[in-house]
Amino acid sequence: MKIAVDAMGGDHAPKEIVLGVMKAVAQYKDIEILLFGDETKINEHLTDKTRVKIIHTDEKIESDDEPVRAVKRKKKASMVLAAQAVKDGEADACISAGNTGALMSTGLFVIGRIKGIDRPALAPTLPTVTGKGFVMLDLGANAEAKPEHLLQFGLMGSVYAEKVRKIERPRVALLNIGTEETKGNELTKKSFELMKNQDAYEFIGNIEARDLLMDVADVVVTDGFTGNMVLKSIEGTGAAFLSMLKMSLLNGFKNKVAASFLKKDLMELKAKMDYSEYGGACLFGVQAPVVKAHGSSNANGIFTTIRQVREMVEKQVVETIKSEVDKVKVGGTETND
């Protein structure tokens, strides 16, 4: 199994990318890594080249580059070359911690969309109070969506939850402003109707945002605009809560003593709420596994993302989506980009 990795994407590239790669190849003897990026900078950190091949390029996509323009103009960028390796059959999947929009564009324009899937979807696994987590999509690949798109998102998320997260018959829910079938706008009402009347996956109805982290669903479906807002809200709320808790525990002698006893528990709580522990965000709907690692990923974050991609390839997630897509076909599908 060969995995193409963009060594130059992310806040801590290439050091943390390279360290994560070395940890992964040491753990999994069945993988080879193709590292795309500046060979000199990569070699500063690559102390073990076992099953690691460097493909040199000076070009990279910056975090502030306009995604589509960058992908079309920077043909030799590390991210683009990694995707091209997948397209050419030289790698089975690709990973980048770089520009999210550029990676989505690369997945669509270079690797290509699955026939029958109208729109791709970005899907991370988010934390729950039980530590189980849930898959949520779309979190930003499409600002707007149609009911048939959300229907397909449910299928893709369900396949991933079953194959990679090992959940038998995953519970798929639709994010809405109420649990009743009649609640919501035109998009959610029509999506509910389509999802209720299919048998490709287990649809359990609407879910409200306040219940997202309560482990009531394994897959939650929404449009990309709403999903991205929810993700940022969860991130912001979590950070604010931990900050307030820290200030309270450090305010006064008694609180500081209590904090010393609670330190281990608080660190475990912080780790439980860190969704990078589940790996990266999958770009579903393209012809091969494409995963966006968190931009601030350290070596362990890259390692968990490689582990995640390895599972996706091994469990044939993309192939399963391709074989199942006709079960959620509504009328004609849009022409592939």
Swiss-Prot record:
A GO molecular-function annotation: phosphate:acyl-[acyl carrier protein] acyltransferase activity
Ranges that cross the membrane: none
Family: Belongs to the PlsX family.
Reactions this protein catalyses: a fatty acyl-[ACP] + phosphate = an acyl phosphate + holo-[ACP]
Entry's localization field: Cytoplasm
Function according to Swiss-Prot or TrEMBL: Catalyzes the reversible formation of acyl-phosphate (acyl-PO(4)) from acyl-[acyl-carrier-protein] (acyl-ACP). This enzyme utilizes acyl-ACP as fatty acyl donor, but not acyl-CoA.
Name of the protein this chain belongs to: Phosphate acyltransferase
Pfam families according to UniProt: FA_synthesis (PF02504)
Keyword Transferase: yes
An annotated GO BP: phospholipid biosynthetic process
Domain of life: Bacteria
HAMAP family xrefs: PlsX
Subunit structure of this chain's protein: Homodimer. Probably interacts with PlsY.
Record keyword Ribosomal protein present: no
UniProt keyword terms in alphabetical order: Cytoplasm, Lipid biosynthesis, Lipid metabolism, Phospholipid biosynthesis, Phospholipid metabolism, Transferase
Protein's pathway: Lipid metabolism; phospholipid metabolism
The enzyme's E.C. designation: 2.3.1.274
Species in which this protein is naturally found: Listeria innocua serovar 6a (strain ATCC BAA-680 / CLIP 11262)
GO CC, any one term: cytoplasm
